[in-house]
Amino acid sequence: MRMLLGTFAALLSALAIASAAEHHSCDIPDYLLFANNELKRVTAVVKNDHRLTIVVFGTGSSALAGPNGPASAYPARLQDLLKQRLPGIAVKVVPLVRSRQTAEDMAKGMEKLVADEKPDLVVWQTGTIDAIRRIEPEEFRSALDEGIEILQKSGTDVILMNMQYSPRTDIMVALGPYADTMRVVAQQREVPLFDRLSIMHHWSDTGAFDLFASGKDDVLASQVHDCIAHGMAAMILDAAHLRGNEQKPAQ
């Protein structure tokens, strides 16, 4: 199990820094970003209180290594983008990394998260460790329900984010059942789903990022995270019915 975890973590690191550098594009089909689920608390606090606090709660794929890693990772980029698109709004994005925790582990920490951080929105990034450890899908679903219920009862908005895509990990780990469970739970709980698995699959299919490649180029890692941040910012603004200043990702 430790060997599998280590190997999978290495592959996730590799795919995060792999890209087609000469033809970099952040294009994401609308159907993967925009749905009918709303972020009502985000709408209210932005319009009434002129502020927004977001917690990115999840595994290590929300972070980047190196001295410039924190500033280049998608939570920091998301904060920068929302500040640009929502002038006059005090935006804060707090990354809370919980490496190697299952959805159940994270659900147990939701009440403390709400009490400590007082977020308006939680981006709950999960699924990978459950798939690696082959947690029963029904147990995974129950954990998602538990965590979302705690957040919704506190008045906090939620976005679910599923796992990363890599052609190599498809062979090693069965991500599909867990991604399907997250889609069902998101629909039933009426929360947006940032379908990172399908989005990265799209980038792989279109050649925007070569997810078979690997290396240690921090610039390429930043490009992947920048694209994720752009997609997440677009989803938040749409679901909260906010017209932000238009900022397109660098091509």
Predicted regions and their residues:
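Positively charged n-region of N-terminal signal peptides that target proteins for export
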Residues: M1-L4
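Bacterial N-terminal signal peptides
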Residues: G6-A16
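Catalytic His-Asp segment of secreted/periplasmic serine-dependent ester chemistry enzymes
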Residues: Y165-Q251
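Internal alpha/beta domain cores that form substrate/cofactor-binding pockets in large enzymes
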Residues: T53-V56, K83, P87-E117, I129-L160
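Solvent-exposed loop/turn segments at secondary-structure junctions
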Residues: G60-A63, R98-E104, G127-R133, Q164-R168, ...
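Serine-esterase "nucleophile elbow" of acetyl-processing enzymes
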Residues: H24-L96, K112-K118
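Boundary at the C-terminal end of the N-terminal hydrophobic targeting segment
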Residues: A18-H23
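Active-site segments of SGNH/GDSL-like serine hydrolases
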Residues: Q125-T128, I148-A179
